Amino acid sequence: MDLPIVLSHKTAWLYHNVARPSEPFSRASSLYDEDSLANEAEPTASLPKLGLDAKGLRASTAVEIVADYLISLGIPREELDHIDTLVNFDFERSTPAGFRCHVFGAPVPPGHLIEVAEGLLVVDEAMCFVQAGSWMSEPEQLEYGYEICARYHLNHLSTGDYIEMGQRYTVADMIAYCNEDRSRQGAIRAAAVLKRVHDGARSPMETATAIMVAAKRSQGGLGYAKIELNHRVDVPNEFKYLAKAGYFEIDVYAPASGTGIEYNGSDHLDKQRSASDAERMTVLSALGFRMIVLTGIQFAHQLQLHRAMNAIALAMGIKCDRSEAFQKRQNDLREFVIRHWEGGL
């Protein structure tokens, strides 16, 4: 084909789910240059050759090639009834069966394109996040924001566990992209969602805890966005006789009230881990923090989590909404954030 195919929107989200985070990215310099597929930095392995650069390639054949490649990565065939693609301008749009073509309206920023195979690119997650508002609900987009800025990767298309990894984007990175052009479709909504996203979640459970606090009340959250994740607390010298560790990290922290929320999952049931947790709580309480623990069992039961969230609201000094309507929304949000936990609470 004359121009490389750029995966975008939901197809890009599907790709980022199954892509191995440890693989190096190959950035495209432009969609127009002859060297458009040149890398900013040499990848450690050659890119797959799919045959998309063959002269006179029929669009229907290109659809089949791309679909087969995505399926080989682990994307279910039923998710590929159409493949979302992106072009710079409307005159480049084509509508072969199997492709859903979106128009960016300007040259696509090359720094936000990743080459994944010869002749095939994908928008990066900053761009994909802005596009996500066209098919995700707000809670889904909020969760996606936390995942993009997290220190883990979770494949929503697999039943496997999450994997730990370095943080790839910061909230500041994402906001900066939104601010490049606020008139860009989806940018205003994405920027609003990012006000409730925070850097550095270490697990889906931490993300779930943060969402229960930060999501809007209309979505079942406490509507309290002024939190930090993994807030570091150094143990002062005069308290070091109380703990082995020199510092602790609080999973979710509200600075205004000094409230800390810890998520203790099933891995905290180990005897040694329980002893360390008890020591942590003792020291943090001695330092004046108002500590509250959430458990997987509470997340698994509506009323238990509702009571726990009431306690968090009380500690933070915000109103507890005990209405039936809010409890329904809160339970919907609870079910949403734990939908992939597969019993690993």
Describe each PLM feature range.
Residues M1-Q185, E324, N331-L345:
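Short gly/ser-rich loop at a beta-strand->alpha-helix junction or flexible surface loop bordering the NTP-binding
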Residues E164-L345:
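Surface segments flanking catalytic/ligand-binding clefts of nucleic-acid enzymes
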